[in-house]
Every structure is written in C-alpha cells, then in structure tokens.
C-alpha cells in the first residue's frame, strides 16, 4: 500500500478518534481543519476542539477557517497538495471546488448505513424509529447532504439496552477501522463505489428539546425507543407537579391497561408503570429538578405522594 498524504477535517471527540487512528497508521496527516475555538464552561473561556487539541499534541498544522467558501481559504487548502481529504463531523460545508481539490477527492465517515438516515442525527433517529441495525458508511463526498457514492459499509446490531450514548461509543469504535480499510483499498485502486438508492433515502434531522417531551398517548414501545434515543441529550421528560421530570431508563410491559393513557397504574421498587395507547411503560430511572438521575425506588422514598396509582400525568396538549 502506498501511504497517502491526508488532510483531516473534523471537530468533536468522534472525529478525534478517527484522527488518532490515522496518526498511528502508515499514512501522513499533513494538516488538520477544525471549527474555530468556542466559549465553553462557566467562564465561557475559548476552548479548542478535541481534534485541534490532538493535532497540536502531534505538531500537525491546524487551520480554523470560519468558511471554506472564500477563495483565499480554498487556495490555502490546495497548496497543501493532499492526496485525499478525510472529513468526520467537521461542521462546515465543503464547496465543490474543495471537494475536487485533492487527487482522490474527499471522503466522509457517516454514522449510519446509507442511504438510510442521511443528516445530522443518524444514531438518535435510528433508535427512535426502532431500527434493529445500524453501522458506518465511508462515502465519496459530493455537494449533496450525505448523497455521495458509498465506498465501504459496516453493520452493527442495535441491542434492546442500547442508547444513543452506547451506540455512539460502538460506532466510534467501528469507524476508524473502516476508514483505514477504505484508505488502503483506495490507495491500491481496489475500491469500487456504489450509488445510493434514492428510493431508500431518509433524513435524520437534529433532535430538539421540544421533541423530548413524552406523550403517553403513544404506544409504550414508541416511548421506550424515544427514551433511548434521547439519552444522553436532550433527555426525555414529562411535566408533573409543576416540575420537569427527566426519564433516563424504561421498559415495555406487554399487558394491556384499561386505564386512560398517562395514568399511573402501579408504583414500587420495580418502577412506575404508566398506561399508554398500547401496553404500559415502566420507568426505572428518573431525574427530579436539581437532582442526579436516580432509581425510581429511591425517588419514591421521598416523593411517593407524587406518583400514587391512579394519578393522571397530563399529556402535552392538555398542559399547553
């Protein structure tokens, strides 16, 4: 395999793990592009991205343009003479002139099996939709949103106890190895590109805090999927006793309830059972305002009066 001269573009920890894999490979990372430093923490101090911090540790030149649309930034990138540009959760749009600059173009690591779940939140949307499988796609970038030809795909079963946090970790483990495999095949000219089937494409829009509100008029299975998708952010919740109560862990009880949706059917050490449109949702772990996430059994010790059987939890429509 002929080592490649690589420009790496990425910003968060997920991207940094891929950069780390490249740094320990035979390839040469000649430059790193990342988002400008952002205010963070209580003091709102300007803080470098995880990718920038890693690049500086390895004395790699770092570029932080606010945009790659300006000719000056494009000429600066072209002057680096890279064979290929690897893009992982960078956060800036790459114009066509940039995509066409490296000899082998630009490739991207995406956290889904394309063309399903193009866009910003593929891990979360896969969980919420009840998908049984996800994975990583290495694709050749074009000007569309995750529409480029697919070069390599990995597959990962979604387990019942997976959350967005656990899937993120699993895909962050799969991605770097897949990237190195794709680069090796590209270097040797043995990789064939596969067009995406537009008929199978859908989009994973960013999650919003508004979406995180639980509606017990939905089936229990849907709510269980939702809670897993919104863990660790923005975390599913419901309003009760004038408080926002976050829900971290649930399970589905298949037995039907004759109670109205949102009614607390039982509350004890096992959890709080709530009637839904189909089946019951058992809440195992919650978080009261100003508190840490706790097992329901511990919350009932101090707030059992809030969750007595027969209590009706208001639906979003009723409380607006």
Curated annotation (Swiss-Prot):
CDD domains: FMT_core_Met-tRNA-FMT_N, Met_tRNA_FMT_C. (6S)-5,6,7,8-tetrahydrofolate binds at residues 112-115. It comes from the Bacteria. Belongs to the Fmt family. Attaches a formyl group to the free amino group of methionyl-tRNA(fMet). The formyl group appears to play a dual role in the initiator identity of N-formylmethionyl-tRNA by promoting its recognition by IF2 and preventing the misappropriation of this tRNA by the elongation apparatus. GO terms for cellular component: cytosol. This is Methionyl-tRNA formyltransferase. InterPro entries: Fmt (IPR005794), Formyl_trans_C (IPR005793), Formyl_trans_C_sf (IPR037022), Formyl_transf_N (IPR002376), Formyl_transf_N_sf (IPR036477), Formyl_transferase-like_C_sf (IPR011034), GART_AS (IPR001555), Met-tRNA-FMT_C (IPR044135). Keywords: Protein biosynthesis, Transferase. The lineage of its organism: Bacteria, Pseudomonadati, Pseudomonadota, Gammaproteobacteria, Alteromonadales. Its EC number is 2.1.2.9. It catalyses: L-methionyl-tRNA(fMet) + (6R)-10-formyltetrahydrofolate = N-formyl-L-methionyl-tRNA(fMet) + (6S)-5,6,7,8-tetrahydrofolate + H(+). One of its GO terms (molecular function) is methionyl-tRNA formyltransferase activity. It holds the Pfam family Formyl_trans_N. It is an enzyme of class 2 (transferase). SUPFAM superfamilies: FMT C-terminal domain-like (SSF50486), Formyltransferase (SSF53328).
